[in-house]
């Protein structure tokens, strides 16, 4: 299995400092209870001064009239959103972030390739990795979405393996099945890119990197597939099941709206035991 990684979303310096010893990455955002917005530059600077952990800045501009609903319409690009996102990416880089997470969509339910491509190009010019937000779960076609974010060169994507934002609408087993399909789509998309660029022999095949996942003998080897990062209700109690799909997890470890250090420790222990 690939070395496990844990991404923890935080919206304060205190929670960042508590999570840092256990996290591979900290996703910095503002107002986590509303699923997060672009963090203030001052938060990135203070966390950067306090910890050495890889920092991801969520890029989700907030305006006085921003809708709080977590629907497709809330993530559609326009000039105001693009102007703000551009400045926020520049500010995040200057403040010490290592990555940004973006996820702008079109009204037809597909990835906004132009908007995301422009922001990703800017981020990479500033030496930032680029990831895709959980807006992936709002897409009309997950297979096409995976091809799209692969074409955009996304490093990883956070997804609950559901359609929509409410992870509770599906059983754990249903989510695992969707995530497995996402992982195979990611491998297929990466392989297609490699074949197109002449970097992969069409006869090369792969096996799943995870012992509990089904073998897929006809999928070409994909060394640079988008990393599937299960998120949405990930806990120590179910982490092992999610890790049957991916060794990368996204968990806030919050109880009653507050970061819970005991849950963080339990989750970290489960992930370490899976190595």
Located regions from the model:
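Glycine/small-residue-rich loop that forms an oxyanion/phosphate-binding "nest" at active or ligand-binding sites
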Residues: 42-113
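Hydrophobic faces of well-ordered beta-strands that scaffold small-molecule active sites
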Residues: 4-8, 26-28, 55-59, 100-102, ...
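Glycine-rich phosphate-binding active-site loops on the catalytic face of alpha/beta enzymes
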Residues: 27-34, 95-107, 154-166, 245-264
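Glycine-enriched alpha-helix->loop->beta-strand junction motifs that scaffold or abut catalytic
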Residues: 22-27, 51-54, 96-99, 125-127, ...
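Active-site-adjacent beta->alpha loops and helix N-cap segments on the catalytic face
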Residues: 32-51, 106-124, 139-144, 163-183, ...
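Catalytic cores of alpha/beta
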Residues: 14-18, 65-91, 137-151, 219-220, ...
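C-terminal alpha-helical cap/extension of soluble enzyme domains
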Residues: 62-63, 67, 180-275
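Catalytic domains of carbohydrate-active enzymes, especially glycoside hydrolases
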Residues: 10-31, 95-96
């Amino acid at each position: 299995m690939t070395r496990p990684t844990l991404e923890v979303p935080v919206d304060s310096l205190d929670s960042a400092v508590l999570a840092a010893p256990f996290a591979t990455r900290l996703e910095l955002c503002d107002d986590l209870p509303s699923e997060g917005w672009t963090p203030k530059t001052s938060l990135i600077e203070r966390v950067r001064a306090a910890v050495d952990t890889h920092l991801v800045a969520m890029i989700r501009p907030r305006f006085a009239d921003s809708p709080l609903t977590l629907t497709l319409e809330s993530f559609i690009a326009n000039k105001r959103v693009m102007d703000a996102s551009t400045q926020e990416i520049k500010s995040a880089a200057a403040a010490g972030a290592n990555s940004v997470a973006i996820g702008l969509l079109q009204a037809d339910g597909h990835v906004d390739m132009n908007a995301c491509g422009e922001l990703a190009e800017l981020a990479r010019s500033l030496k930032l990795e680029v990831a895709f937000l959980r807006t992936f779960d709002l897409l009309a076609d997950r297979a096409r979405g995976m091809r799209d974010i692969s074409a955009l060169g996304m490093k990883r994507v956070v997804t609950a393996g559901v359609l929509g934002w409410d992870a509770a609408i599906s059983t754990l087993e249903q989510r695992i099945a969707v995530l497995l399909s996402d992982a195979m789509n990611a491998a297929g998309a990466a392989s297609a890119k490699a074949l197109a660029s002449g970097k992969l022999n069409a006869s090369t095949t792969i096996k799943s990197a995870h012992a509990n996942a089904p073998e897929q003998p006809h999928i070409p080897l994909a060394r640079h597939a988008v990393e599937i990062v299960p998120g949405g209700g990930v806990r120590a109690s179910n982490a092992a099941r999610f890790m049957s799909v991916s060794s990368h997890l996204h968990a806030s470890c919050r109880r009653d709206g507050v970061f819970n250090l005991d849950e963080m420790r339990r989750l970290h222990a489960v992930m370490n035991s899976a190595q």
